[in-house]
């Protein structure tokens, strides 16, 4: 084998490695490490517990617990549990001013961007950190239609986060309290966190109040 052939071979291997990192490290799609049957049951159990908390809990946002019949959800779908590539902020002092549903503002720490593939699209979402909680405030093509117009929230499990990757489980996406009670002030997703796909996973939204209708109409 000539020197030229060896160099061409090495260049070819390098190109393949680059393409792999570029196109496949963004997301592996559905998390193949889970047992679909067990995962579905665990998710249904958590939803049942949340319904009970909303129905009888002292901190429930539901004004009329007597008529509460449970939250509305999309069916569990492992395809909406994805692995994302993390792009952390080198400067940990970067902050995000978040507008609240009542017009006030709060300041959160910018933690990282999550880059992943979902429904055939490359998506990018900002992760914020508040104390020890990592959250994503997002909207998607279902917002204002099948889900709350003011957006939904997704919390990340630190146990499923590494330096370069994190699991995003949109089956656990939930509505803020202000979706059910206008007495609560809730953070609204930043403009950059509007997904170009319909996330048919997590909590749906069928209740409409004057406040929620205004948020549903937001672009």
Which residue ranges define each predicted feature?
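Hydrophobic membrane-insertion alpha-helices, especially the h-region
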Residues: 5-22
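Ser/Thr/Pro/Gly-rich low-complexity linker/stalk segments immediately outside membranes or between
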Residues: 24-41
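Extracellular/lumen-exposed scaffold segments
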Residues: 67-71, 95-99, 103-110, 126, ...
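Extracytoplasmic/periplasmic/luminal assembly and interaction segments
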Residues: 46, 54-96
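Acidic, glycine-rich flexible loop segments
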Residues: 140-174
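Mid-length scaffold segments of soluble, non-membrane domains
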Residues: 88-153
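C-terminal partner/receptor-binding element of secreted or periplasmic proteins
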Residues: 184-219
């Amino acid at each position: 084998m000539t020197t030229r052939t060896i160099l061409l071979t090495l260049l070819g291997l390098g190109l393949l490695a680059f393409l792999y990192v570029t196109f496949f490290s963004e997301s592996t799609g559905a998390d193949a490490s889970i047992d679909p049957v067990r995962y579905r049951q665990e998710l249904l159990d958590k939803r049942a517990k949340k319904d009970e908390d909303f129905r009888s809990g002292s901190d429930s946002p539901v004004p009329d617990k007597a008529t509460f019949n449970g939250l509305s959800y999309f069916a569990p779908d492992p395809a909406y549990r994805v692995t994302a590539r993390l792009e952390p902020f080198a400067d940990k002092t970067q902050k995000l001013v978040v507008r609240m549903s009542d017009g006030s503002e709060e300041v959160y720490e910018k933690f990282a961007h999550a880059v992943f593939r979902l429904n055939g699209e490359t998506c990018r979402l900002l992760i914020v950190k508040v104390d020890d909680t990592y959250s994503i405030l997002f909207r998607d093509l279902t917002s204002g239609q099948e889900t709350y117009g003011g957006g939904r929230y997704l919390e990340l499990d630190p146990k499923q986060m590494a330096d370069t990757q994190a699991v995003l489980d949109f089956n656990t996406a939930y509505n803020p309290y202000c979706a059910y009670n206008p007495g609560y002030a809730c953070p609204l997703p930043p403009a950059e966190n509007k997904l170009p796909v319909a996330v048919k996973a997590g909590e749906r939204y069928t209740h409409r109040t004057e406040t929620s209708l205004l948020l549903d109409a937001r672009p």
